[in-house]
């Protein structure tokens, strides 16, 4: 692209009308499916008309086939929506979900959109949920694990290829015993569920996110708990080389010693031959030299120079840095860390706004590494962060799918909110694949943070004679009107 400007490579950025997409076409499959769905449970209907609609727009913009859209919408309505709990009755969640801790507003679901590394790939959509059940928020279930375990069990029965033995084994090793007061004092959500809904697949891939809330366990994860869990899950002779490489870097490398282990892991719910588990860390250093050192494990893991160049371009764009800014210097941040200036209600160990995870399996000599950037700590607005990434994608030949993502987020919140607030965009994640940066967006429905706006969209205004009167934002058709 040479010296082309962002407007030249991405001209659609100048047109909100174009970027908003065609609401009717975005929701056509959603409305057709909705005609035949039950409406007797108000809680499930609420989640369907809000988050189900978001999912429909995502799939339309990601070019999923209509058959796949119908299949996944039915899965969403009958498997996911019933496990999202009661509909909100105020802007304060009755139970604060651990989805996107420190960033989320308590909504029990979040989304991700993965672009891939070239123009021939389709976006890949995932959901991350905390299952809500009858015991959630009670003293009978302080870790909120019963609803999640029930859901995982049902997914194992319902979805071909889902296997749970590794998840159960890892969970047993990191589950706190709750036998001492310090552990009970921090007890909270312990299981999240990831659901990958690929465009071309006939199935759904499942991941179990496991969180220990025991302060005594976290320092022992790398040294004793994860090694025992690996041998239990993969077999007594399973190679620990990948885990040992991570531990060596964290404990002995000068750059690794900036890292702090988080009490979190995640397990692919599939056969042991391909199921990986994740080790999450956060850092106190935000210089690009440090980020690059972690992504290569201090040179232990070879990566293409072009990958590192692309990562630097993205990091500098997100931070608004001059290209000549020294890679060894830490950029200053004047951004308030709370989304929209409000605290989420959950403590967040990720003070710097940067986390990494290492994907490990005994058969791989190196872990797969992903960098996650908390947008609320590094950019002024959601749109500023989104533009930094989508303009990079456009220059790389992925302008259509970059625009598709803009269509999704602009269908979820007004453009003015994207320009002036933070809260929809949670993270951007970056990994190396085939000599390029593989980018994933993590974003949030903001059901509680935008409670008033959501209610207004669900219930159009009445005129002085009691007739429905749609707001200007909802002209053509209410975005939630499905029945």
Swiss-Prot record:
Viridicatumtoxin and its derivative, viridicatumtoxin B, exhibit anti-methicillin-resistant Staphylococcus aureus (anti-MRSA) activity. Moreover, viridicatumtoxin and a C2 acetyl analog, spirohexaline, have been demonstrated to inhibit bacterial undecaprenyl diphosphate synthase, a potential new target for antibiotic development. InterPro entries: Aro_prenylTrfase_DMATS. It comes from the Eukaryota. The lineage of its organism: Eukaryota, Fungi, Dikarya, Ascomycota, Pezizomycotina. Pfam families: Trp_DMAT. Prenyltransferase; part of the gene cluster that mediates the biosynthesis of viridicatumtoxin, a tetracycline-like fungal meroterpenoid with a unique, fused spirobicyclic ring system. The first step of the pathway is the production of the malonamoyl-CoA starter unit for the polyketide synthase vrtA. The aldolase vrtJ may be involved in the synthesis of the malonamate substrate for malonamoyl-CoA synthetase vrtB. The polyketide synthase vrtA then may utilize the malonamoyl-CoA starter unit, followed by sequential condensation of eight malonyl-CoA units to form the polyketide backbone. Signal peptide: none annotated. It comes from Penicillium aethiopicum. Its EC number is 2.5.1.-. Pathway: Secondary metabolite biosynthesis; terpenoid biosynthesis. One of its GO terms (biological process) is terpenoid biosynthetic process. It is an enzyme of class 2 (transferase). GO terms for molecular function: prenyltransferase activity. The gene is vrtC. Keywords: Transferase. This is Prenyltransferase vrtC. The keyword Thylakoid does not apply.
């Amino acid at each position: 692209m040479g010296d082309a400007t962002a407007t030249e490579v991405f001209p659609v950025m100048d047109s909100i009308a174009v970027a908003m997409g065609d609401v009717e076409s975005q929701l056509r499959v959603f409305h057709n499916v909705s005609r035949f769905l039950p409406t007797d449970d108000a809680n499930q209907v609420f989640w369907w008309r809000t988050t189900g609609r978001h999912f429909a727009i995502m799939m339309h913009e990601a070019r999923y086939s209509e058959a796949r859209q119908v299949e996944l919408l039915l899965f969403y309505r009958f498997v996911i929506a019933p496990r999202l709990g009661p509909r909100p009755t105020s802007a304060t969640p009755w139970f604060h979900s651990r989805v996107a801790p420190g960033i989320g507003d308590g909504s029990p679901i979040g989304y991700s959109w993965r672009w891939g590394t070239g123009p021939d790939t389709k976006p890949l959509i995932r959901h991350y949920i905390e299952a809500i059940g009858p015991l959630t928020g009670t003293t009978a279930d302080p870790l909120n694990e019963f609803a999640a375990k029930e859901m995982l069990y049902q997914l194992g029965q319902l979805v071909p290829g889902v296997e749970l033995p590794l998840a159960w084994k890892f969970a047993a090793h990191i589950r706190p015993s709750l036998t001492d007061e310090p552990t009970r004092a921090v007890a909270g959500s312990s299981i999240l569920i990831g659901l990958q809904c690929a465009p071309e697949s006939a199935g759904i891939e499942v991941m179990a996110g496991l969180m220990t809330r025991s302060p005594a366990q976290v320092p022992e994860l790398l040294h004793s708990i994860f090694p025992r869990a690996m041998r239990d899950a993969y077999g007594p002779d399973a190679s620990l080389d990948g885990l040992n490489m991570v531990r060596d870097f964290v404990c002995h490398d000068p750059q690794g010693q900036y890292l702090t282990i988080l009490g979190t892991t995640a397990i692919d719910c599939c056969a042991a031959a391909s199921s990986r588990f994740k080790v999450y860390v956060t850092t106190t250093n935000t210089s690009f030299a440090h980020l690059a050192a972690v992504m290569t494990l201090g040179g232990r893991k070879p990566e293409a120079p072009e990958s590192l160049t692309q990562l630097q371009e993205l990091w500098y764009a997100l931070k608004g840095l001059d290209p000549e800014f020294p890679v060894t210097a830490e950029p200053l941040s004047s951004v308030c860390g709370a989304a929209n200036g409000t605290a989420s209600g959950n403590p967040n160990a990720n003070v710097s706004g940067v986390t990494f995870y290492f994907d490990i399996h005994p058969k791989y000599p190196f872990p797969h590494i992903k960098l996650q950037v908390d947008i609320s700590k590094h950019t002024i607005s959601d749109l500023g962060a989104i533009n930094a990434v989508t303009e990079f994608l456009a220059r790389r030949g992925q302008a259509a799918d970059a625009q598709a993502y803009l269509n999704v987020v602009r269908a979820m919140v007004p453009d003015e909110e994207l320009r002036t607030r933070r809260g929809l965009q949670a993270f951007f994640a970056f990994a190396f694949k085939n000599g390029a940066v593989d980018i994933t967006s993590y974003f949030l429905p903001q059901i509680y943070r935008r409670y008033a706006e959501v209610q207004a969209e669900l219930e159009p205004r009445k005129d002085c004679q009691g007739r429905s009167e749609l707001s200007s934002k909802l002209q053509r058709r209410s975005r939630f009107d499905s029945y």
